[in-house]
């Protein structure tokens, strides 16, 4: 809606008023309104008889065109110019069309324009065109009826029906043998294809503002009940694949010789902005083909064509964030913008006229949004609209959000030092924030460093002091090179087989045997913490001797690199094997793998001091060429003396999918946390899937730690194995079996 500003000069109001009187004198009221995509009321045009002759109407029409030219030539006021062009030109184009079609019909006067709205509210008008044909060839009756004096007026949808004739009078005996049962006229195919169609005249003038949105076709006839299904293929002006319809069949008992009317079928490929080859205001054709060898008789075809507005699409708005206090240009990126429309942007209740740039871009200027005393941020919905006649608008696309910063844009500062004060305040604020951020950073680093340095102390059972700690817990990276030192000249590094955030793993040789080499670099202070963990891993592994523990061979100092030499496992991790569909795993092999893991963990839990792995998962279980599984990656492991009546108060570690609920809750825990992780590994072995697949980490932590979520064991898994899994991941750690018991139960299966 365009509202006339009270500040327009009086001579411009006079021109508008004269223009209004001129239109009223024509005795003619023409308007059209687009109401969105509505199947029943999409487009409406109407005309009313006038007592004046067609020649006088034509003269008035010419005068109206001359008046537009004068206003364009003057062009002293942009608002006045927009009102005149948007309001008159579409109406004059449609008026010319209606005068041509109704040159023998008298017209009556109807005055509905309102001067305050400047004739921008259009009246709905409803008409109807219905044409029919009775020839098997393309009929011209539709074209004649649409241009005849007695032709009905235009309606929102165009409907026509055609009766098929010209086919064979007797079809195959199994179908269409009694054509008089269902209709007088029909087309019947036997073993060859047929084509039939109609030419119809489209009554909608090509204004570019509304297009064909939908075509619904209904077929009536008798169809063979024997497969294959017949297929009707519809074309609109040669556009292929406009519609494919599979004919529904009825059984002979239900419909031995009857007329069947399909449910209406909609052509699926009609674009929201119409068919490319469709000719508005001119002749069009629809063809129906039957290509199958099945027998079918078509008696009647009805097509219903629905029109609607051109629907442009907005995909994004730039900028879409704040601050915005008015005056900024906002660009809307989308599709199907067209120049003949008047694009409007509504910022809340404030309207801003849009600017057409091209078919994919338009812009609007943000109006001043805040009141002079406003101190609260305001949110505004930006709605893109298309106004066809300047007064009736309809929403076409998404509502966008623009945040307007709290400010007072209309009050000019009185102090000459206003900007200087602002700069000082902003500068001080930024400096304070930087100081706080740097302080927080160093505090966090200090806490992390202290926690890692004292990690072994926190890993002890409650009540154990420093004197009771094992010497292995006091290891740092400075003693790493004293653990089974290897001379660099004995090592040949070959191919990289793995990479982490702080280290890389290579294959290589040492004294003629193939080994795995973990290579780490000490680049800065932060890496020192990682190397302390690496030293702890090497210290623990150097003391372990078991067939199911990955063998530690030694360390090598090659500044700035540190090398840890380990036993090479050619098949890689258990995780890789379980997720490789080309590797077949039968029950004996799966049981053997589970038993290997249980034996290795039982050895760790029987050590003195006991070793808690804390990160047991399929990624940290390596497999040799004989499918023997060995436990590795002890970077998060810890050792403490046995106090079976105490629980540890250790920092939560591990991977959430495999971590026990008490660890996720940051509760004290024991070596039974490893038993829970083992249960998840058993589930991986029998399912060969990822636990809690698709769930985000935070949801796993909450669901497992608080709501007792567990993976689902497949029903095909044997009862003893299922029972072992469920006991191992019991909520109560005391209910979980020890690895010594697990080994016995697996050996008995």
UniProtKB/Swiss-Prot annotation:
One of its GO terms (biological process) is signal transduction. Residues 1-31 form the signal peptide. Residues 32-423 are extracellular. Keywords: ATP-binding, Glycoprotein, Kinase, Membrane, Nucleotide-binding, Serine/threonine-protein kinase, Signal, Transferase, Transmembrane, Transmembrane helix. This is Probable serine/threonine-protein kinase drkC. It is an enzyme of class 2 (transferase). Glycans are attached at residues 157, 189, 283, 358, 373, 381, 397. It is a single-pass type I membrane protein. Belongs to the protein kinase superfamily. TKL Ser/Thr protein kinase family. SUPFAM superfamilies: E set domains (SSF81296), Protein kinase-like (PK-like) (SSF56112). Residues 491-749 form the Protein kinase domain. GO terms for cellular component: cytoplasm; phagocytic vesicle membrane; phagolysosome. Its EC number is 2.7.11.1. It comes from the Eukaryota. The chain crosses the membrane at residues 424-444. It is found in: Membrane. Residues 445-749 are cytoplasmic. InterPro entries: Ig-like_fold (IPR013783), Ig_E-set (IPR014756), IPT_dom (IPR002909), Kinase-like_dom_sf (IPR011009), Prot_kinase_dom (IPR000719), Ser-Thr/Tyr_kinase_cat_dom (IPR001245), Ser/Thr_kinase_AS (IPR008271), Ser/Thr_Kinases-Pseudokinases (IPR051681).
